[in-house]
Regions:
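Short helix-coil boundary/hinge micro-motifs
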Residues: 1-141, 148-152, 183
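A structural preference for long, well-packed, hydrophobic secondary-structure segments
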Residues: 138-140, 157, 176
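Short, cysteine/histidine-rich loop/knuckle motifs that typically chelate Zn2+
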Residues: 141-146, 163-165
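Cysteine-rich micro-motifs
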Residues: 157-167
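Basic DNA-binding region of bZIP-type proteins
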Residues: 165-182
Length: 183
């Protein structure tokens, strides 16, 4: 599997990493990094949210639905405008999941979600807390027109998302613009 299909876990939160499962979202050729149930299971494993019950094709559809409900709400939040009420309603449907229980083993752990729907509910709750709490001030959007990836930037110094390709393209474009001006 090529680099373009590799999951990204550098956006600053699990829900932001869910957004990154679709790369170059606004480009001509978006990259779906979670095209199958198996890839959804891999992703849920990586974020320690693998459900007890088997993940289905319907769960994959729900994961895509959550991701695409979150994206416009996150972009609106970063832009400082109210999100579309239909998207907020779509996101709200994921908030009715099971509650989280904790247990102590060699460390504090949460019990695994029973279903993929419960796992997605946990991700939605994290997103809502992030989007409505003080950490929303740390959210940024990649300026690359085909990316527009949302990421957390507590330092306030990052210009592009964590994807090195976006930063490289942006720097090359800026260099060419400076060079053209000096000629």
């Amino acid at each position: 599997m090529g680099d373009r299909m590799a999951f990204r876990f550098d956006s600053g939160a699990t829900w932001l990493n869910l957004l990154a499962t679709r790369g170059t979202h606004f480009g001509e050729h978006p990259v779906e990094r979670m095209p199958t149930v198996g890839r959804l299971v891999e992703w849920l494993d990586a974020v320690e949210l693998r459900p007890v019950r088997k993940v289905s094709a319907a769960d994959l559809e729900l994961a895509w639905e959550l991701r695409e409900a979150l994206r416009p709400v996150a972009l609106a939040t970063v832009d400082g405008v109210p999100p579309d009420s239909a998207q907020v309603k779509a996101l709200g449907r994921f908030l009715d999941g099971e509650s989280v229980s904790l247990k102590v083993t060699d460390r504090l752990v949460r019990t695994p979600p029973a279903t993929a729907t419960d796992a997605l509910g946990r991700i939605a709750r994290q997103a809502v807390d992030h989007l409505t709490g003080p950490e929303r001030e740390f959210l940024s959007v990649c300026p690359e027109h085909d990316c527009r990836g949302v990421f957390s930037d507590p330092s306030g110094r990052r210009r592009w998302c964590p994807n090195p390709a976006c930063a490289t393209r942006g720097r090359v474009r800026a260099h060419r613009a400076r060079k053209a001006q000096s000629e």
